[in-house]
Each structure stands twice: as structure tokens, then as C-alpha cells.
Amino acid sequence: MSSGYSSAPSVSHTSSEADLNRIESYEDGVDEEASDEQRMCGLSELVTSCLTSSKSSRQKDSFEDDDDVPIEIVGTLKKSKSKKKKQCPPNITIEKKNGNSSPFLKSSQFTDVPPTIRFYTKGTKVTKPARKIQSRLTWCHNSLLPIVMRQTLSASHFTIVDESLFHIGYWGRHLKSAQYKALQPHQKVNHFPGAFHIGRKDRLWMHIRNRLEHFGEEFEIMPFTYILPTDRQELLKYLETDVNRHVIIKPPASARGSGITVTRKPKDFPTTATLVAQHYIERPLTINRAKFDLRLYAYVPTFEPLRVYIYDQGLVRFASVPYNPSVTNISNKYMHLTNYSINKLAEADGIANKPVPKWALHQLWDYFDQMGVNSQKIQKEIEDVIVKAFISCEKPIREHMSRFLEQEFICYELFGIDIILDEDYKPWLLEVNISPSLHSGTSLDVSVKAPLAKDVLNLAGIHVPPSFDKLHTADYSCRPRNGTKTREQLVKEASWVAAYRDQHGAIDNRIFKRLTPEDTRALVEFEDELDRIGDFKLVFPTAQTAHYQKFFAEPIYMNILLQQWQIAQEGDRSIGIDRLEQLCRQKHMQSDQEISF
């Protein structure tokens, strides 16, 4: 397929307040199944008593030794000789599996780092926590909270409560940017401010096109797109050169197939309303003569440093009519569109004589393997597309977050990634949804989405709101990261970013010669996150992704640190984990700032 790619002017990432209000009036790539009367849940403040320290004294464990020699901080990663058992925060007991009951808490790998709540699928018997803890296990009710998520929360003894009551979690429609400022340190929400930069089709294309200008075919990951009405003349010129060319017209912030048409008629191209027109892939790969696309799930816990996970399972969605394109049937949505929300109606409309099929992702890989097609190669290429999409959009999202978010740790996000394969098995990014539907109308949906909901909440690292003594626990997740860095941290970051530029991206293990408290917090958080990975796969950063650093709009210290950490850890993760554990024992993470709430 001819890509139709061409150079483009640079794109500004800056949004005025007026633009922001206009953009946030749209539903940014939401594809949740829900009614028209869905309402935004206003997030209440946490109760003061849950943010104050408990009066209980900290007991000294028998394995502590005041004469312990500190681990060497200078030098590259060195394995600790210490055999000391790590300790949990006081007043938090990590219970072991009790008979047929699964544990409620997941301990950290590191001393004084709080445990996280474990989540399970429906039907799992989970050890009941103490009444004092259970009273804090509350989740904000809203009409977009899917059933599989409710069941997962219920299994771990959460209660769904009204938005006006104390709650520690929220899953629903994206918030307005200003609402993030009211969030409290122990609340968790499933969106980032500024996620519209990847969830809106026009913004997503603008940012990918910007990277395309710098890196050429490396970023030919999305069908060429026109933003209407601005690019209307460019689009008309493209269509005039070949009568067989068509484009797919989409609203920039819709989902579930709403408002999509395949056309080449100028009357369908607006002169006022904002739409996007995407090159139609004329030769898609088909199975049993039907066009199909892939819904994958990507999870991002933070944009600084950027980390991207992809879920092991997903869905393959088929068109309900055999693919046989011609001028006469170009408007047949059941042939050309693969959205399940559209094709599930084909049987009722008399277009199909049986329900539209849907596969689990592993069925597609098995099918390819049986056909002699290298499914592993296709999966790697899909991962490449997804990582590049996030890299294209990370800078404007980070900039937006810096304006509206004081604690990045309170946010996480699950994205729905739609991919189509052409006849050469090349993956193309169609769009990114910031509220992928977890509605489970079939047994196949449940088999994919119920474990997904459980694994997302586990990766999010949700803590019991603390009542223990913060002076003796590394409750680093509750501390603002913006504007509180020490001079030591700022100097180190500036020097390594400068070295990265001077050495054209070359970095080595000297970056670990002195791990600052901020470095240590970031690495501890990352290692514990990997310990809760479930059926997700980390695709960025890995030991093999160093070459992606050049694609970022600007070098970011934490990205560089984490990338080098992954390279250093490739042989034996226990070496780095042991070093971090020794730093935790020395209370290194708390040494750079006052603890106040």
C-alpha cells in the first residue's frame, strides 16, 4: 500500500485555556458501553483522620542491627551480602494464604515500603482484613464502573459508595483538568490529565506527524490522516489522482463506530465542523474473506518515566459481510467497518444469518502459526507501533500534567489500542481509546476482561490509606514530585541530560554511582510494579529499547535512568534489587525531604 506520507510543518503542543475547555467538552476516545445519562463522579477529599499518623509506636524487629555496615552506594550495581529479612510498615500485617483463602495484601520487596491490596476475579475467596482497614476500602460509584471491575473490587472487600463519601478509588469517565488538583494523595483515578493528546484522533495524528517529520518512515505507523476542514484541499488533491481512492471520515473524539463513513465525495468533507479523514487501507488482511481488526490493551502507570505495558490477551473483531470492495458497496458499513458495536447489529438487520464472530487474541496467533506465518514477528511489530504512539504524545501529556497534577502517583490509565493488518501483515494504528469498554456481553468478553480488570488494579498499586507512623515508612507515593527536588537531584539530572546530548545518546552504569533518594524511589516503585505484573508484558523500557530514546521530543533524566537500569538488570535482577533493599534499610528514600501532611 502506498502510504501517501509527506513532510509536514512542526506542531505546537501548547493549548490555550479556551482551546482546553473546547477540547475537554468532547468525549476523548471513549468507547465504554453506557447510557446517555452518565454523570461525572466528583472526587471527594480524603477524611483528615486517614491522613494523620497513628499513635502506635514502632516495634524494633529482632533482626535489626544498629552496627550494620551500610552498603556501598558508590560504583555500579553490586550484590549485597546482607541476609537480613525486610520489614513491613508497622500496623500492617502481610497475611499468608489461610486454607482456601487468598491473601488480601501483597508485600513490597523492600523494607518499610507499604504493601498493596491484592485483587482477584469473581468467586475468589479472599482473607478478610481487620475491620479498621475494611472501613477504608471504599470505591466511588459511577455509571461507567463496569461489572467485571465491580466484581473484582467486591472480591477484595471493597464497598461501592456515593461520591460524597470517603473513597480511595475511581474508575470512570475522564475528569476535567482542573478536577485533578482536588485529588488527595491516597486516591487513585484511571486517567491522566492531558490524555486527550493521544485519545483524540486529530491530536494523535498531529503528534505522530511531528515525529514523522523528524524520523521519516520509522513513524509510518498510522494511515495518513487529514484534519478537516484545515486539510480539505490537500485531501481533495489526494483523491483526484486516483478514482479508486477512499478515506474513512471520523469525528475526532468519538468511539464505538459512531459517525464513521467511507467516502470519496467532496460533499462529505466539512468546511466548518472538525473531522478527520484517514487513508483507507484498500488491501487489508482478511480471514475467511472477512476484514478484521485487533483490540489490544496498553497500560501506562506514569509518563515520567514513560512505562508501557501490553496485556497478553485482547480481541479480534470481524466485519459481518465478506470483503469484496467496489464502488457500489463502498458505503456498506458491515463490510468495511470492524467495530463490534456496528457489526453486532448485522443479524438483526438481516445482513448476516448468524452472530458476528469474535476471537480472543491468542486464537489469531495460533491461526497464523498454523498458516506458517510468523506470529512472533507480527507481535513485535505491533509493540513497536504502540510504543512509538506513546512516545509521540508523551511530551504534551507531561506538560499538561505539570499544570494540573501535583502527585503523578494518583493516576494510571488503561488504553484500548485498535490495530489493523494489511495484506503484507504490516500493522497500522487506527486509534487509541482512553476509556476502552470493559462491558462483557459474551463469555469470550468475560474471559478476557475479567482477568484484565484484576491485573490493572494490581498493577496500579493501591494502598490501604495509612494510619501507621509515616516517619518510619517509605510512603514515597504520597509525596509531591514536582517542585520538591533537592539541589543534588537537580544537578545530577542536568549533568546526565547534558552528557546524554553530548554523547549522542550514549549512557553507562556511572549513572548509578550515586543513587539519590529520588532515583531510589523511582526504581523501588518500578521493581515492585514488575512484581505485580500479572498477564501484562512490559514493552518499554526493556534492555532492548535503548534505541527508542532518540525518538523522544527531548531527553528526560528519569527515562534515561530507567533505560540504563533495564540494561544493567538484564543478567540478574536480584543484584539491583538487593542494592535497593539496602538503601531502603538505611532510610535513604526519606533522607531528602521533610514528611508533612
Swiss-Prot record:
List of residues binding ATP: 250, 256-257, 278-281, 291-293, 338-339
Catalysis: reaction(s): L-glutamyl-[protein] + L-glutamate + ATP = gamma-L-glutamyl-L-glutamyl-[protein] + ADP + phosphate + H(+)
Annotated positions binding Mg(2+) 1: 418, 431
The keyword Magnesium is annotated on this UniProt entry: yes
InterPro entries noted in UniProt: ATP-grasp, TTL/TTLL_fam
Regions of compositional bias (Polar residues) in chain numbering: 1-18
Biased amino acid composition, Acidic residues: 26-35
Keyword line: ATP-binding, Ligase, Magnesium, Metal-binding, Nucleotide-binding
GO biological process: microtubule cytoskeleton organization; protein modification process; response to hermaphrodite contact
Segments forming domain TTL: 134-472
Positions of a protein binding: 256
Stretches for region Disordered: 1-39, 80-107
Keyword presence, Transmembrane: no
Marked site positions, Essential for specifying initiation versus elongation step of the polyglutamylase activity: 256
Family: Belongs to the tubulin--tyrosine ligase family.
Primary role: Monoglutamylase which modifies tubulin, adding a single glutamate on the gamma-carboxyl group of specific glutamate residues of target proteins. Involved in the side-chain initiation step of the polyglutamylation reaction but not in the elongation step. Preferentially modifies beta-tail tubulin over the alpha-tubulin. Involved in side-chain glutamylation of tubulin in sensory cilia. Together with ttll-5 and ttll-11, required for male mating.
This protein's name: Tubulin polyglutamylase ttll-4
